[in-house]
Every structure is written in C-alpha cells, then in structure tokens.
Amino acid sequence: MEKSGGIREESSEKTFSDFNLDPRLQRAIHKCEFEKPTSVQSETIPLALEGKDLVAQARTGSGKTAAYLIPILELLLKQKQIDENQRGIFALLLVPTRELAQQVYNVLEKLTAFCSKHIRFINVATNSSDTVQRPLLLDLPDIVIATPSRCVVHVASGVLPLDKLKFLVIDEADLMLSFGYNEDMKTLSRSLPRGTQSFLMSATLSKNIASLQKLVCRNPFILAVKDKEASGKLTQYVVKCSEQDKFLLAYILLKLRLIKGKILIFVNEINRCYRLKLFLEQFGLKSLVLNSELPVNSRLHILEQYNKGLYQIIIATDESGMMGEIEELENNVDFVEEEVISTDQPTLDKMKDQENADVNDESILAAAKDKSKKKKRVKQDKEYGVARGLDFENVACVLNFDMPSNTKSYIHRIGRTARAGKPGTAMSFVVPKSEVGKHKPTSLESCKKDESVLRRLEKKQISLQPYSFDKNQIDAFRYRMEDALRAVTTVAVSAARAAELKQELLISEKLKSYFAENPDELLSLTHDTVSSVRLGHTQRHLRHVPEYLLPKGMQAVNKDIGFVPFKKNNRRKVFKSRKNPKHRHDPLRSMKRKS
C-alpha cells in the first residue's frame, strides 16, 4: 500500500488553471465561483488525473465532491475527443443517502454547464419506480449516481452494465457499511472490471475504510488532508445542563437572538423533534422538521429552500448515528475517527486497539440493553441522512440539542457549519449523569452517554470551550419555559407528528405532479406552518419578552413611547354599548309578558 507524505497543507499558490483542465470545465468552475482549489482538491486532482486510486480523508465542507468530479469529467472529456461515439456507463458514484445523491447531482449539473451535450448523467437514488429508471439506464448515460442498494437492483436486472466502467467513487465511505450496505458492496465489488480507478472519500478514518479499501482499491494513495484556515474558523462550545434546562437555553438562545444567522438543531428521536418544534412555536419561533418519516421530495425541497435563506431554523433527527452505534456494538469494535493523521502517529490498527481500550464499559452495557429498542425505532427510510455529507449552505450554528452517541457522528454534525472557509459555531448540550432521568417528560435514554462521549472528544484533543450563562438572568425566564413545556404533552406531540406527516405526503404528491407543470408556484409552498394541533395551555403573552427580563445590554435605549393624546376615543365605547345593550341586563325588561 502506498501512502502519501502525512499532513497536506493548502497551497495558496495553486489555481485550477495549473491542472490544465478542459476550457469548458474551467469555464464551469469559474461560473461556480471557485476561486482556488481547496486542500483536498489540490492534492486529489493531480493524482486522480494520473490514474491513481485514492483514499482521501478531509473535514466536511472541504470540497471533496468537486475533488473527484473534476478529474472524472476531465478524463471523460479527453476520452470523448478520441472517440465521440463510444457509449457506456463509465463512472459510478455511490453515496449512502438520497439527499447526498441529489446534492452530487446538483454539483454535476453546474460542472457540466458547458459540456452537457457530451456528458450525460442520471440519479437513480430517487424514489421513482424501476419502470421509469429502466429506459434511462438502457440509454447508457456516462455517469450514474446511486445508493448501493439501488445499484445492486439494477445490476442484477441487467440494465446497469459495468463492463465498461472506468471510475468508481464511494462518497462518505466511512458510512457505507454502518448504513447496512455490507452485502451490497461485496456484491458490487464482484461485478467491477479490472483496472477500475477507485475514489474513497471520507471525513473520518475507520475500520470500514480499511475493509472497503480491500474490496475496491489497488495500491491506493492515502491522503489525510488538513486545512488549517478552514478548521480554525470553527468555534466549539459545550454547555452542561439538566434535561429540562436544554429547553430553557434553546428558548433564550433563539428568542433573544444570541445566535445570529441560520441554525441547524440536531436531536436523537423523531418525537423529540416535534416536541421541540411545538415548544418553540409557543414563543413565535417557526422551525422546519427533517426526519426519515417525511417523503424524500419534501426533504429535498425543505433543504433547497433552507439553502435559499427562506427559513432560519431546522430541527433534524440524526438516527443514522444511532444505527452506527448499534453496528459498533454488534461487531465488538469501536470506530476510529481522526481529523488529522500524521506520519509520526501509530498505525491504523494500533489506533483501533487504543480506541477499544478507551471505551466506557458502562456505556456499552447500557447501549446493549437498548439495542432491540433502537432497532425497532429505526424503521424509517434507510437511505435518509442529514448529518452526513449534505451541504447546508451558510449555517451559522450547529446546536447539538441532544449529544450524538459517538464521536464520529459528532464530527459529521459540526461539519455542517464553517464550510468553505466561512466561520461557524457548534454548541452541544451535555447532561451530567447526576441529572439524567430527573424530569421524565424531557428525559432521553441517550443522555446517559453524554459524558462518556464528551470525554472521548477531549481525548482526541478537540477544542471544546465552556459556554457560560448568568444563572440569575436565566432563572428569570424559567417560569415562561415551564408554562410552554407543560402544554407540550405526549398526546400533542403524537398528533403533531401525524398531522405533519399527512400534510407532507400531500405536498409530496403535488411536488411530483402539479408543481412540475407550475414551477413558479413552487415558491409559495411552505413547510414551516404553525402546527394545527391545539395546545390547551398556550398563552399569547409568551411570544413577547418583557423588557424587565432582558439583559441590560439588550434593553431599549430610547424609552420614548411617542405622543399619547389626552382625548379618548369613544368609538370603542359606542360599539360596546350597541353590542351589549343595557336592557338585556335589566331584569324587568328581559321578562316576557304572558298572554
């Protein structure tokens, strides 16, 4: 196995013109406003153009998608110049989720803006039927984007021939096996022709990478890339609080706008998602919900409109992190995640042994007890994932309302912010063991592992700063939080979940039919409508924050309320008198005379 020379830093001198790319491809790159190649692009593109197999590890948001698409398109365009009439499926791009497949498709559309007549591609990871996809595949597009499960189905049916395949990409490779694609990947590896150039792209290195590498790669270059400039702009905070105080802090952070910009909130359960949504609604804070129950068309449309800036808050469930934990327990191994791997560190196998030794025995036992319960819970769309690989644009803050169950999931979550050199903030709520289970309505089983996950993050030298609040000022808001939380009952959460699912199913059908014919009206479609579920204890005054509760720095400087006339408006009085005439309250006049 060939290995590159340790950490690769970004070279500010390199430009895309240094790669001698096709002019059409360079124009598309310029149109995408890519000023210069990122670290992973600077290292990957030259090696890929030489025909090398690559295993590239870089932080999320570092441009890994373009890092493999650009060299593949360049080599395909050169091939087309030699023989323009050659037909076949030359590139297969495998991704773990449907959302990521659509994202790759969108990037591919932009990069082929000036060569779309010569490069044809298709995304078969959608929820369209096989009868629709079959003729499109029989037309032999140059590039196919798919999840492993969809790919295996089409290969078995004979409509996806791989005999002419030249490029294989496994994006988010560290997640492929944890998503349950073990057998699918083994089946596909037996169908690959010899000499296929393989790309394994990942945000972390794990045992899964080593097993996939043996299946599809031949003497790959292993690139562990760190972009100091990008990673330095991510600020990570941790807040230790009780389960109930999570809701209090979320209310304060969002209502007082202590976090400015778009926010992505992660929770660990679908019911938790709707509980938080209903809670925030009572304070006039609208939010979107993303989970595996929603139709894929609705999920993609929500993501698209969030990226356009139409919405500010998304509450997403990260059930894939729970699935990854189950597989770790069943295989009796623990994932190894490293943001940077240098040449003077131990080998991959030694690091795995060290990581296994660090696992908290108590957390393993607790997770094993809940294994069957978790398996029942993960019955939704297997190919759903929002924490992994998706490009949420301009996210100012990632809020881990519920701490992820492993460090690998944490790295993927916080990677949704501070992308492409922009600053970002990640904040995590950690529940101490002494506080777990004290407030049953807001209690969550996964909170038992919060402290063990935090210790493992600290061992990996991930910089987590404490975020301090003034306790006296926080307690002043507590009664408002308790009033709102008391109204969000289990029955209300279940009703909201059912109502939203029904609404989104209807919207999904409209997206497929009506809005296909009326694209202009698509903008009027909203996903953040206030829940129709009536909460018995909802109080209007919660939407307004009294000035006496605000910190001194946030109180209004100008307290002049303007001109108040001395003369009263008597119209209201006249209206009341007409509406409730005095004779109705006069017992003598209200009596009816008997004939």
Swiss-Prot record:
Instruction: State any GO BP term from the record.
Output: rRNA processing
The Helicase C-terminal domain sits at: 233-485
Sorted alphabetically, the keyword list is:
ATP-binding, Helicase, Hydrolase, Nucleotide-binding, Nucleus, Ribosome biogenesis, RNA-binding, rRNA processing
UniProt-annotated stretches for the region Disordered: 574-595
Q: Is Transferase given among the entry's keywords?
A: no
Gene name on record?
Answer: dbp9
Annotated motif Q motif: location in the chain? Answer: 14-42
Residue numbers of motif DEAD box?
171-174
Highest rank taxon of the organism: Eukaryota
The EC number on file is 3.6.4.13
Q: Where are the transmembrane segments?
A: none
Which residues does the annotation say bind ATP? 58-65
Can you give the residue ranges of the Helicase ATP-binding domain?
45-223
One GO MF term: ATP hydrolysis activity
Report the catalytic activity.
ATP + H2O = ADP + phosphate + H(+)
Name the InterPro entries for this protein.
DEAD/DEAH_box_helicase_dom (IPR011545), DEAD_box_RNA_helicase (IPR050079), Helicase_ATP-bd (IPR014001), Helicase_C-like (IPR001650), P-loop_NTPase (IPR027417), RNA_helicase_DEAD_Q_motif (IPR014014)
Q: State where the protein is found.
A: Nucleus, Nucleolus
Q: What does this protein do?
A: ATP-binding RNA helicase involved in the biogenesis of 60S ribosomal subunits and is required for the normal formation of 25S and 5.8S rRNAs.
Q: What is this protein called?
A: ATP-dependent RNA helicase dbp9
GO terms for CC? cytosol; nucleolus
Recorded domain comment: The Q motif is unique to and characteristic of the DEAD box family of RNA helicases and controls ATP binding and hydrolysis.
One Pfam family from the UniProt entry?
Answer: Helicase_C
